[in-house]
């Protein structure tokens, strides 16, 4: 069948039709105008436009029913396999009645898009030799169109083809323009957020900046960054809630990872978008969203923060309003999450570098302090006495464990040396032992030294400082004079021992540490507990494995060895050549009480080395006495002039029938400790059993 484009509409009629159709802004309006024109000209009762999208293989349908109701529909199944598919393969006019239509396209007839009609006609829409759809006309009566009417329908179709193509081009141009504008705006947002977050190297500041930018651009009210904690199976949550536009609430907490939505994202490494309901099985900290926002929260979006193949954490966004997480917004939020991941990676790296730098500085200071003090400490354990042998057996027994050790003994007995021996024999010997003296230090300064502080934590805290517990991570911490620790600081020490965690002064961040504690004191902690000067729970926690160091007076057989070792060490340090010590000097030193113990002995030897001329050690006897007046048994018991120590002890033992201890024993009468008397009896060769 041939068509006459101009038909007999007349120039004016054709112009009016063309002008009317060209004025339509979109395809739905074009379909409605076409229906009115064909209805007014009695050519059809309704008209529609079917467009074919070759790229997506979908069909779009625009029509107006006889009752004036507009219809818009698209799919890639029923409609796409209807009459438009036929017109694409055979570009001739397609016409049929409803019965034929139903037999040919039963699914389309049953879809409700086409109410029962009399006759149907579909003409191809073409532009530049390309068919891109069809223009359909429907009559309610079963009466085919005459040849003259087909001419007019074809004329309408030609005009509709031109107009539809223009509308499509305009729509596509608008879509492209909108896309360009959106991409430009998205790029600006990305640049703004990237510049804002990449300059933040502190995690708290970074989270605050991320929340501010996301809230500003997306109006999202609840923003969190979730990172894995140093503690196993724990999460650190940094949250910001915009309950008040001008005063957002910032929170930080640590929660269990098990059973959380974040755990699902860590496993899948994929975005998770869910509609929230208060009845959903949520983890306790996720249910807190409802405590904060009531039932306003609608949607939760969790975006993985990836650095290469490593997942650093999760960006978690909760929104009260619907339709915030659109496809376009989610695409942009994914890109933002990539930038945030870079910033988080940088901040964590900076945090680690800063921590290692501070640790290195503190280690250098501590090492310098240790080197400065090394000359005043004996460099190795010296002693062959049974008392020292028992101590060393205990050291060897406990060293390989991580148990807390409490070293007890008088001042100057070598408690730090024993602590160092325990550390060197332990599995932690690869790292330097950290030490801290608790005596004569104010509580605030001691707390800062032990646990560290943040910048601005107190007046004068101009920089962050790492404490001894943090410095001793994976190593041993020696707390000397622990009995002098202020009572108000003891609970914090107890918490570290029990939980292996603490906070720096001025911070609420929990720091995990793996420290083996070795404590020492010259005080009677049991008595201090009874006098409420020391916490009983801390005492029990420290007293896991006590080691009692004997005073020097109870191991006189070790004194000659110590004198020789100190003499040669000090002489070498002073550039002297002393290779001989008189036996009388050794006997004199061995007979002394040494209330200052090994430290006092070392000081006496150092003075002797200074005064020595030649290579034989010269001890100034008038400056020291073999038995000090306040500890001499003669002061309390001797009433016979000229009675020496040996004779006095023999006499008192005979009078007490060989009883040493107790209120009526020899030690009590002589004014000595039981252990001191036994030590002297051993030195003088006195057997109490032979005297009884």
Swiss-Prot record:
The keyword Nucleotide-binding applies. It comes from the Bacteria. InterPro entries: AAA+_ATPase, GAF, GAF-like_dom_sf, Homeodomain-like_sf, P-loop_NTPase, Sigma_54_int, Sigma_54_int_dom_ATP-bd_1, Sigma_54_int_dom_CS. ATP binds at residues 409-416, 472-481. One of its GO terms (cellular component) is protein-DNA complex. Residues 663-682 bind DNA. Residues 381-610 form the Sigma-54 factor interaction domain. Required for induction of expression of the formate dehydrogenase H and hydrogenase-3 structural genes. One of its GO terms (biological process) is positive regulation of DNA-templated transcription. Keywords: Activator, ATP-binding, DNA-binding, Nucleotide-binding, Transcription, Transcription regulation, Two-component regulatory system. This is Formate hydrogenlyase transcriptional activator. Residues 202-344 form the GAF domain. GO terms for molecular function: ATP binding; ATP hydrolysis activity; cis-regulatory region sequence-specific DNA binding; DNA-binding transcription activator activity. The keyword Transcription regulation applies. It comes from Salmonella typhimurium (strain LT2 / SGSC1412 / ATCC 700720).
């Amino acid at each position: 069948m041939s068509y006459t484009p101009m038909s007999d509409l007349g120039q004016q009629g054709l112009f009016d039709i063309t002008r009317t159709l060209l004025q339509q802004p979109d395809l739905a309006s074009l379909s409605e105008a076409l229906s009115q024109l064909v209805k007014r000209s009695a050519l059809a009762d309704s008209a529609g436009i079917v467009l074919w999208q070759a790229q997506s293989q979908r069909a779009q349908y625009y029509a107006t029913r006889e009752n004036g109701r507009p219809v818009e529909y698209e799919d890639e199944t029923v409609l796409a396999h209807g009459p438009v598919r036929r017109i694409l393969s055979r570009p001739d006019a397609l016409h049929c009645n409803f019965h034929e239509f139903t037999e040919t396209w039963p699914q389309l007839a049953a879809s409700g898009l086409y109410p029962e009609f009399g006759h149907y006609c579909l003409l191809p829409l073409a532009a530049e030799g390309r068919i891109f759809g069809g223009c359909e006309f429907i009559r309610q009566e079963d009466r085919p169109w005459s040849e003259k009417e087909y001419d007019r329908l074809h004329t309408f179709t030609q005009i509709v083809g031109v107009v539809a193509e223009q509308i499509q081009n305009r729509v596509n141009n608008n879509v492209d323009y909108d896309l360009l504008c959106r991409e430009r705006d998205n790029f600006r947002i990305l640049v703004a957020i990237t510049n804002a977050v990449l300059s933040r190297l502190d995690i708290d500041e970074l989270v605050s900046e991320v929340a501010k930018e996301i809230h500003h651009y997306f109006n999202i009210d609840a923003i969190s960054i979730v990172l894995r904690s140093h503690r196993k199976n724990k999460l650190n949550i940094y949250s910001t809630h915009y309950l008040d536009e001008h005063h957002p609430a910032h929170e930080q907490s640590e929660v269990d990872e098990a059973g959380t939505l974040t755990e699902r994202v860590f496993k899948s490494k994929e975005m998770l978008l869910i509609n929230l309901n208060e009845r959903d099985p949520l983890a306790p900290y996720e249910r807190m969203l409802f405590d904060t926002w009531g039932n306003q929260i609608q949607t939760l979006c969790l975006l993985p923060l990836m650095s290469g193949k490593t997942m650093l954490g999760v960006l978690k966004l909760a929104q009260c309003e619907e339709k915030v997480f659109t496809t376009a917004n989610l695409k942009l939020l994914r890109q933002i999450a990539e930038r945030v991941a870079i910033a988080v990676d940088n901040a964590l790296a900076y945090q680690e570098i800063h921590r290692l730098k501070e640790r290195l500085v503190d280690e250098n200071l501590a090492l310098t302090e240790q080197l400065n003090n090394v000359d005043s400490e004996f460099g190795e354990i010296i002693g062959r006495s049974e008392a020292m042998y028992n101590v060393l057996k205990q050291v060897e027994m406990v060293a390989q464990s991580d148990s807390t050790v409490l070293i007890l003994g008088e001042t100057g007995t070598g408690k730090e040396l024993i602590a160092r021996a325990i550390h060197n024999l332990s599995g932690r010997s690869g790292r330097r032992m950290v030490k801290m003296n608790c005596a004569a230090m104010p509580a605030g300064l001691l707390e800062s030294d032990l646990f560290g502080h943040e910048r601005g934590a107190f007046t004068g805290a101009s920089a962050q400082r790492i404490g001894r517990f943090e410095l001793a991570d994976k190593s041993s911490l020696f707390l000397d004079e622990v009995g002098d620790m202020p009572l108000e600081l003891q609970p914090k020490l107890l918490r570290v021992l029990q939980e292996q965690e603490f906070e720096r002064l001025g911070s609420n961040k929990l720091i995990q540490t793996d420290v083996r504690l070795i404590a020492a004191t010259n005080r009677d902690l049991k008595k201090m507990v009874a006098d409420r000067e020391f916490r009983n729970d801390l005492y029990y926690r420290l007293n896991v494995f006590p080691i009692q160091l004997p005073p020097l007076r109870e191991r006189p057989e070790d004194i000659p060895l110590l004198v020789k070792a100190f003499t040669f060490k000090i002489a070498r340090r002073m550039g002297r050549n002393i290779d001989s010590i008189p036996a009388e000097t050794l006997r004199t030193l061995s007979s002394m009480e040494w209330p200052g113990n090994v430290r006092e002995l070392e000081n006496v030897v150092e003075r002797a080395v200074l005064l020595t001329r030649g290579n034989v050690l010269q001890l100034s006897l008038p400056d020291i006495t073999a038995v000090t007046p306040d500890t001499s048994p003669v002061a309390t018991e001797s009433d016979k002039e000229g009675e020496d120590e040996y004779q006095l002890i023999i006499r008192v033992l005979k009078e007490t029938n060989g009883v040493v201890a107790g209120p009526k024993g020899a030690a009590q009468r002589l004014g000595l400790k039981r252990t001191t008397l036994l030590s002297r009896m051993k030195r003088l060769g006195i057997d109490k059993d032979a005297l009884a």
